[in-house]
Amino acid sequence: MRKIKTITYLFFVILLLSGCETTQSVRLNLEENLLSPETRLMTDNGPVIGFIDQLGVKKWLGIPFAEPPISELRWRAPIKINNWKTLKEVNSFSPPCTQFQSSLTADGLVKPGDIIGNEDCLYLNVYAPSSSKNKLENNNELLPVMVWIHGGGNTTGMPSEYNPEIFVKTENIIFVSMSYRLGFFGWLSHPLIREQSGLNASSNFGLLDQIMAVQWVKNNIQFFGGNPNNITIFGESAGGQDVIALYTSPIAKGLFERAISQSGGTSVT
């Protein structure tokens, strides 16, 4: 009986994956933003170059912070991204994590319920004001950092839906947004998963993605002009709920100094 249930379960998994491995979101900003030498810098993982928008905001869009959670890494805790040597151009959003199209943001090209996104989606985006400087020796001159966790019921949503340019420019902060696994891929609880060891058995893969993203920020944000000792995480709705989870998680201890939960709540048992 267990074998039959397992085969049935795998059948539905394959059916779902066949429709989402390569699907792209039509809302991605695929316009080629001109690379700017001023945004070239070295991270712990390798060199990147971004661009400067019309408001003078520096942007690095689509920086990988974990290995793609595909194949044998599907339904596993995220793994640190491998280092790269060649200059990585990060001037456009990565595909969002696989999800069903929300009725709130559907347009003429996609319908509610359509599968959009890609499993290879663990990327983050960094925004900095024109005044930011790379890795200053005096941490007092580094800027405050705010890390955004988007809402959407942990089933939908993507960083490209939020535009922090004015916020960054007027408040003189470093802003970071991230993608994390959603729905079926981020929160699946199943006996076969619970048989795994360590964090692989948690089923909270979306939260683990968020923690790894904040860890990446902690390790690298100084290169973008941000203060690694002045990080605030904040999120709205399900993102606010996730903020509370990170605030109480021992795994995330020491990664940030402040937390803001906007219209998010959770229960503790």
What are these regions (language model features)?
Residues 240-252:
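Short glycine-enriched nucleophile-adjacent loop
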Residues 16-19:
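C-terminal motif of bacterial Sec signal peptides marking the signal peptidase cleavage site
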Residues 1-8:
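Bacterial N-terminal signal peptides that target proteins for export
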Residues 253-266:
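A conserved short beta-strand
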Residues 224-236:
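Alpha/beta-hydrolase fold nucleophile elbow
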Residues 151-152, 205-209, 237-240:
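Active-site loop->helix "elbow" adjoining a glycine-rich segment at hydrolase catalytic centers
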